Regions:
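Glycine-rich phosphate-binding P-loop
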Residues: 1-5
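ATP-dependent small-molecule kinase phosphotransfer cores
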Residues: 19-79
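Small-molecule kinase domains that catalyze NTP-dependent phosphoryl transfer to phosphate-bearing small molecules
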Residues: 32, 40-47, 120-165
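Short, amphipathic alpha-helical "lid/cap" segments that border enzyme active or binding sites
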Residues: 68, 164-169
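RNA pseudouridine synthases
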Residues: 74-80, 87-94
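Conserved nucleotide-binding/hydrolysis micro-motifs of P-loop NTPases
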Residues: 87-89, 104-108, 161-163
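Conserved phosphate-donor/acceptor-positioning beta-strand/loop module used by diverse small-molecule
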Residues: 93-115, 121-130
Length: 170
């Protein structure tokens, strides 16, 4: 995402949305980072026990609503690249949005994590599995759709077949 934004000279938003969500919700950036995209309390067992706002919403709902507002505002400001945070779903009704999902095989994804974050192969595989699972749970909760399913995107690319640079070029 970031490489594409640089290539096209567009604004790029990913984890920097966390700061904006923290400002809007008055929650700490650390808390938002831990909960925001993954919303761990969205399982049926714990959902009844988590904190609620005065309006009856969970804290995770509050975070999602703030992310939604921010993503919509960013899209209104102009062309940009937004990674994750259900942005594809949030912006689905806009005619000026291209939703892209890039996936790859486990080995290459693990290698990328190892190179970027200095993890061992085992650590990379565990991190990848955990992150993907959390994203899928959160995406399903927020959208009632399955994360990574091609029908939810205008374009899906396999970086293991096409290569990272080719995905950027496309």
């Amino acid at each position: 995402g970031e490489a594409l934004a640089k290539k096209l000279n567009l604004a790029f938003y990913d984890k920097n949305i966390i700061e904006q969500v923290a400002q809007e919700t008055k929650l700490s950036e650390k808390y938002i980072a831990e909960r925001g995209e993954y919303a761990l309390s969205h399982n049926r067992f714990s959902y009844g026990f988590i904190g609620r706002t005065m309006q009856g919403n969970s804290v995770d709902d509050l975070i999602y609503q703030a992310q939604k507002n921010i993503i919509c505002d960013l899209a209104e400001k102009g062309n940009c690249v937004i990674v994750g945070r259900c942005a594809d779903y949030i912006l689905r009704n806009r005619s000026d949005v291209l939703n892209v999902f890039i996936h790859g095989n486990k080995a290459e994804k693990a290698q990328r994590i190892m190179n970027l974050y200095g993890k061992t192969e085992q650590e990379a595989l565990v991190l990848m599995k955990d992150t993907d699972k959390k994203r899928a749970v959160n995406y399903a909760y927020c959208t009632d759709q399955k994360w990574g399913v091609s029908k939810n995107y205008a374009l899906c690319m396999n970086s293991s077949i096409l290569g990272y640079e080719t995905c950027i070029e496309i």
